[in-house]
Amino acid sequence: MTTLDSNNNTGGVITYIGSSGSSPSRTSPESLYSDNSNGSFQSLTQGCPTYFPPSPTGSLTQDPARSFGSIPPSLSDDGSPSSSSSSSSSSSSFYNGSPPGSLQVAMEDSSRVSPSKSTSNITKLNGMVLLCKVCGDVASGFHYGVHACEGCKGFFRRSIQQNIQYKRCLKNENCSIVRINRNRCQQCRFKKCLSVGMSRDAVRFGRIPKREKQRMLAEMQSAMNLANNQLSSQCPLETSPTQHPTPGPMGPSPPPAPVPSPLVGFSQFPQQLTPPRSPSPEPTVEDVISQVARAHREIFTYAHDKLGSSPGNFNANHASGSPPATTPHRWENQGCPPAPNDNNTLAAQRHNEALNGLRQAPSSYPPTWPPGPAHHSCHQSNSNGHRLCPTHVYAAPEGKAPANSPRQGNSKNVLLACPMNMYPHGRSGRTVQEIWEDFSMSFTPAVREVVEFAKHIPGFRDLSQHDQVTLLKAGTFEVLMVRFASLFNVKDQTVMFLSRTTYSLQELGAMGMGDLLSAMFDFSEKLNSLALTEEELGLFTAVVLVSADRSGMENSASVEQLQETLLRALRALVLKNRPLETSRFTKLLLKLPDLRTLNNMHSEKLLSFRVDAQ
């Protein structure tokens, strides 16, 4: 990012088009690109976007006190900015400065919508008109992964179908894209489409279901109510006292930001994180690559690194400090805390907390986990970060890696089990709702590993504690999905669970998991096809976690700066490993909108079961 306005409210949620007032000046998203693009599609690997959009509802819970504090300029009856130069300039700042992750809406009013547009093509949510994320015009629907108007939808479709190479921008690729001038610079318009999340791959997830639209409306109303309460009480979020880690037992504490999460155990984040420290010197690209790769290797420990020992040798090795052996394991369960077998969700939660050690003091949590005896615990971490008893590890013959695994070919012992604490099967007597609760809670044991990995990202601890918590709440599921991808056998359409039982996509789909698992398989296939190295996977995981357009950020400028650093390091590493595959970095970035969609689908599915249970 080259420039950034201190008033830039990245990730704003809802903006109402009113009849008076003005919008603060904002930095346009296009100014966040590099200046070395040559206009071709492949050159986007050098001028990549610095932040990426969430799912359609990914930013609905942002701090609304910011987005409601400014009102855009008035519009004339035909929907264009008023004739005054000040209004025109302010309108340009509003539409172009709206962040990619925001959901732009306007109250339905005859003076806000151009009379030339058919009302049947207007996307509404109970009287609120959604705006195009690219140009700010009235959105006609959910196209290519974002709300967009017919003009931008057709422009993006032509661009990708015909592989058009647009002329180089004459204004340093810093054009503002609004409705009245969107056709002036096609290169900047296409970049804007990509930066807000438009993707050919996103179309396969279909249009927004009715249930999701209803949830979006409910979250909008909740955001408005929260904004009114905050503005009336004159109590900004920044006045919250900073929580420092204490060496005592961890007790429950309220989350510092009103950002709901489907995962369990997020209330412990403030105690596990460190207060913001003074800014450290910006590390070099090589330092970022080495530090992130080391943290990823040591914290997200893979089966072929430390889970290849037999049960007998495991305890002995830990006692003696010698490296673990690589003999196959038996499959009986020895010493693993029993999983709950009743229908009590609280019991399941306590079982997970027991495995995680969430009630332990933060001081007992090691700063790093070297592969070997440093981690004194019965449960080890597999390739998805989930705790696993050593007796549940299966040492596969050399070279027998799961199909489409990014680590295929360079690992000796591969864990062939999906790390679910409680695997779903119809004979257990559990309802579909309880199975889905277990499915979501199975990700909980990896939360601590994600937190520890984040603390070792260079510059992450320089962020405010509020922003650290916000990033972790919003990005943990996506991080786990990246690491979970290798456990899907895309070729056979199966998943191997902890019981060593293979479940097909058809079997799991019969229990109501079809849509989400199909999307997971699809994402896993696309990610694994890139054959990322361990270093690339670690840096990509860091980029997924550090996204400046998350909801409720306090200091988005600092997050964007950190994200820029990680993106530069990832791009340098990808081009270094495969210099001839210039489009590989772009393909990798296009997985970010897919992750947002998966995150949204998981949240919606979990929410729907909870609503049905009430």
Curated annotation (Swiss-Prot):
Record keywords, A-Z: Acetylation, Activator, Biological rhythms, Cell projection, Cytoplasm, Differentiation, DNA-binding, Heme, Iron, Metal-binding, Nucleus, Phosphoprotein, Receptor, Repressor, Synapse, Transcription, Transcription regulation, Ubl conjugation, Zinc, Zinc-finger
Composition-biased stretches (Low complexity): 14-34, 69-102
Modification note: Ubiquitinated, leading to its proteasomal degradation. Ubiquitinated by SIAH2; leading to its proteasomal degradation. Ubiquitinated by the SCF(FBXW7) complex when phosphorylated by CDK1 leading to its proteasomal degradation. Rapidly ubiquitinated in response to inflammatory triggers and sumoylation is a prerequisite to its ubiquitination. Sumoylated by UBE2I, desumoylated by SENP1, and sumoylation is a prerequisite to its ubiquitination.
Residues annotated to bind heme: C418, H602
Region described as Required for phosphorylation by CSNK1E and cytoplasmic localization: spans on this chain: 1-70
SUPFAM superfamilies attached to this UniProt entry: Glucocorticoid receptor-like (DNA-binding domain) (SSF57716), Nuclear receptor ligand-binding domain (SSF48508)
Biased amino acid composition, Pro residues: 244-261
Compartment list: Nucleus; Cytoplasm; Cell projection, Dendrite; Cell projection, Dendritic spine
Signal peptide positions on this chain: none
Coiled-coil residue windows: none
GO BP field: cell differentiation; cellular response to interleukin-1; cellular response to lipopolysaccharide; cellular response to tumor necrosis factor; cholesterol homeostasis; circadian regulation of gene expression; circadian temperature homeostasis; glycogen biosynthetic process
Main location: nucleus
Pfam families: Hormone_recep, zf-C4
Modification type Phosphoserine: residues: S55, S59
Annotated spans, Disordered: 1-119, 233-285, 311-345
Modulating: annotated span: 1-128
Tissue expression profile of the protein: Widely expressed. Expressed at high levels in the liver, adipose tissue, skeletal muscle and brain. Also expressed in endothelial cells (ECs), vascular smooth muscle cells (VSMCs) and macrophages. Expression oscillates diurnally in the suprachiasmatic nucleus (SCN) of the hypothalamus as well as in peripheral tissues. Expression increases during the differentiation of pre-adipocytes into mature adipocytes. Expressed at high levels in some squamous carcinoma cell lines.
Keyword Iron: yes
Assembly notes: Binds DNA as a monomer or a homodimer. Interacts with C1D, NR2E3 and SP1. Interacts with OPHN1 (via C-terminus). Interacts with ZNHIT1. Interacts with PER2; the interaction associates PER2 to BMAL1 promoter region. Interacts with CRY1. Interacts with CCAR2. Interacts with SIAH2. Interacts with CDK1. Interacts with FBXW7. Interacts with HUWE1. Interacts with NR0B2. Interacts with NFIL3. Interacts (via domain NR LBD) with HSP90AA1 and HSP90AB1.
Free-text note on domains in this protein's UniProt record: Composed of three domains: a modulating N-terminal domain, a DNA-binding domain and a C-terminal ligand-binding domain.
Entry similarity comment: Belongs to the nuclear hormone receptor family. NR1 subfamily.
Functional description taken from the UniProt entry: Transcriptional repressor which coordinates circadian rhythm and metabolic pathways in a heme-dependent manner. Integral component of the complex transcription machinery that governs circadian rhythmicity and forms a critical negative limb of the circadian clock by directly repressing the expression of core clock components BMAL1, CLOCK and CRY1. Also regulates genes involved in metabolic functions, including lipid and bile acid metabolism, adipogenesis, gluconeogenesis and the macrophage inflammatory response.
Protein name, per record: Nuclear receptor subfamily 1 group D member 1
